[in-house]
Amino acid sequence: MAKMIAFDEEARRGLERGMNQLADAVKVTLGPKGRNVVLEKKWGAPTITNDGVSIAKEIELEDPYEKIGAELVKEVAKKTDDVAGDGTTTATVLAQAMVREGLRNVAAGANPMALKRGIETAVASVSEELLKLAKDVETKEQIASTASISAGDPSVGEIIAEAMDKVGKEGVITVEESNTFGLELELTEGMRFDKGYISAYFMTDPERMEAVFDDPYILIVNSKISSVKDLLPILEKVMQSGKPLLIIAEDIEGEALATLVVNKVRGTFKSVAVKAPGFGDRRKAMLGDIAILTGGQVISEEVGLKLDAVNLDMVGRARKVVVTKDETTIVDGAGDAEQIQGRVNQIRAEIDKSDSDYDREKLQERLAKLAGGVAVIKVGAATEVELKERKHRIEDAVRNAKAAVEEGIVPGGGVALVQAGKTAFDKLDLTGDEATGAQIVKIALDGPLRQIAVNAGLEGGVVVEHVRGIEAGHGLNAATGGYVDLMAAGIIDPAKVTRSALQNASSIAALFLTTEAVVADKPEKTPAAPAAPGGGEMDF
């Protein structure tokens, strides 16, 4: 395919035009009085959203150079969303301001590489100040405030704070669609996995369709069980103890399953069989987690353990198990606390090393099942469009709340950037074009506050100057138009969100400024449709 090449100012201006189109569509959503954007879908109803990354993802421009510019800014929004769950619009506004100021200086003859160094030095200094400004999250109310701002709904903030309070820092909070209207929080006690009983005959409570056992033994096997001969020795030992038995295996079939069902129906021996969760290596890892949690061992021929040689020391214990047709919950496993902590540390190390978002998410789920707990927020709404938008907002708010717990909170409303900038630039000792690069960042830091004010119908420049002159930590409450102590008023942002937005924006801005040529695919002309034979006349 033929390529088009643009150089110098033409290349940079093409990229800037694309960036401006995307940024202008995204920045109208910033702040409590930000507007919504309607996104057309090829199939189904349009989506209405004020989430920066969702809007950015939908924008595809026709001009090849503009398209590349827009793609670069999409990357800023996506990266910020991945890291912190929020701050996508802030990152876009910062990137646009830095690029606009930077290109003006490059056109005036500044050295792009020196500007880049100045930008990077200034951003590092501001990031440091942000972390100094940050206060640790100490109360449930602070988590609720942070999540409420992200979701734009106080009731969402409260339910997320409740969930985090229950499952702890390591816990997993998932968001699911519900058929009922409103919000509902469901907490899981103990470890839960998505596999239920193999046969309905194992139920002990037909009304609730559950098998519930107190103080059971738990046999964990990493293979299929089909022969009753292999299973008999351990069954006899468990029967003598008078306790029920939960068997977790790759599969249980044939005479082994029939024997368990017959004994359960006759009331001779209480047991329930479930399939092991996951597949392949992930299944092995999850069985290992269950074994450590319950104080048992995984019976696997790989490590020389055979089913017919199992004794009671090798099986796990728990205070209670609840098995439904879809899931199994193990409450209060009898595992050794030190071993569980060791496993938790091992999973944490794997999370740090992992490059894949999917793997990291699965490892985080395993960690939550061992160390914290699992909370499910069920979301309902009147229409499909509202449901999708609400679910997305709540998922972002959950990540936002976790970011707040991680690195602390700073005053919200774009004020933290302005006030961190006041002290950060005093320390810098830069000259020439590097000092100009730092000045570009200083001007850009006002961008988010200015845009929040504009979206609230106020004069951006006046608001920025007023905030610069008032006490640290005070700023504009755009919802009311007054100036307040932001922390006390609950207008807060996670430091991680603000820091990530600034760092990602500066990274893309530096790329824009140092670009000297752009190579793009030449759009192919679509051939005109051939004329219909006979002049295209139709005979009716």
From Swiss-Prot:
It catalyses: ATP + H2O + a folded polypeptide = ADP + phosphate + an unfolded polypeptide. It is found in: Cytoplasm. Signal peptide: none annotated. One of its GO terms (molecular function) is unfolded protein binding. One of its GO terms (biological process) is protein refolding. PROSITE patterns: CHAPERONINS_CPN60. The keyword Disulfide bond does not apply. SUPFAM superfamilies: GroEL apical domain-like (SSF52029), GroEL equatorial domain-like (SSF48592), GroEL-intermediate domain like (SSF54849). Its EC number is 5.6.1.7. The keyword Isomerase applies. Keywords: ATP-binding, Chaperone, Cytoplasm, Isomerase, Nucleotide-binding. Its main location: cytoplasm. ATP binds at T29, L30, G31, P32, D86, G87, T88, T89, T90, G413, N477, A478, A479, D493. Transmembrane segments: none annotated. One of its GO terms (cellular component) is cytoplasm. Forms a cylinder of 14 subunits composed of two heptameric rings stacked back-to-back. Interacts with the co-chaperonin GroES. Together with its co-chaperonin GroES, plays an essential role in assisting protein folding. The GroEL-GroES system forms a nano-cage that allows encapsulation of the non-native substrate proteins and provides a physical environment optimized to promote and accelerate protein folding. Belongs to the chaperonin (HSP60) family. This is Chaperonin GroEL 1. The gene is groEL1.
